[in-house]
Amino acid sequence: MEEIKVSGFVNILKPTGMTSSDVVCKVKKILKTKKVGHLGTLDPAASGVLPVSIGKATKFFDYFLTKDKEYYAIVQFGKETDSLDSFGQIINKDDKVVESTQIESVLPKFVGEINQIPPKFSAIKINGEKACDLARKDIDFEIKTRQVKIFNIELLEKIQKNRYLFKVNCSAGTYIRTLFSDIAKEIGTIATVPVIIRTRSGRFDISSAITLEELEESKKVLLVKEIFKDLKEIEVNDEIAKRLINGRKVLASEINEDLPNSDFFITNKKCVIGLYKVQDSAMKRIVFLYEN
């Protein structure tokens, strides 16, 4: 197979049952290119937005990995599986009926910075091996507590007895399964999360996501400029460009143009040097894109 050089992003609508790595392999095959990576794991039992970077755009990995996320989740109170999702084995049941008022009363405790222990059935690496693989082998291990931020939790609808629909806006690294397991404990019961849909990941929204079948048909890759079309481009002279390329300090005052408060691209003769922001009155590199 001859490799085709392509660079940009694909906003994939990941189906339930596929791993994020499965999606990457499919994209490589469809686009006939090797340099492909996803921008934040989505659990096999979850579906929704999985941004995938291709070629030069893989340099944005760290940038997107820290961006906020939005999820819709259906939570089943009174039932617990070992993986806290629909793929696991039922390990506990509780007959307690959970009412909307009980849920609403505890939600404020989970807004803001909170600590959570990710589930053992997860892609977190423990001594180089995935936690989920160790869990399947019944190997005992501990996962460290992590701090995440929940911007908003909204109870949208009671679907049926003990089954509710929620919307969550949160920081990267948040485990929705753990969040609702902890909420259930606060109420005095247990829970599992049979449905998780990621509707937004940073700049990528579910409204523009495409299936792998649609990618197969269109081969459409979003260019970097399409994803960042709202960001300003700042043109600099050769001398400043050389200093930036070599990683030397450039003060904001040396650039003869009003610099935005948000991120911006710096270019020289139509060549993009990278994504920058102003920090401590100087240029702070976010993503270096220059290739000699």
Task: Label each PLM-derived region with a short phrase.
Residues 29-33, 51, 140-173, 177-188:
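The conserved catalytic core of RNA pseudouridine synthases
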Residues 63-118:
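Acidic, low-complexity central loop/insert segments
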Residues 1-15, 19-42, 46-49, 67, ...:
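Accessory RNA 3′-end/elbow-binding domains used by RNA modification enzymes
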Residues 62-77, 141-155:
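Structural signature of FAD isoalloxazine-binding scaffolds in flavoprotein oxidoreductases
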Residues 52, 73, 128, 179, ...:
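Residue-level signal for inorganic ion chemistry
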Residues 55-58, 79-80:
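Short, charged/polar surface micro-motifs in flexible loops or helix N-caps
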Residues 123, 130, 135, 162-206:
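Pseudouridine synthase
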Residues 122, 126-145, 151:
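Extended alpha-helical targeting/anchoring segments
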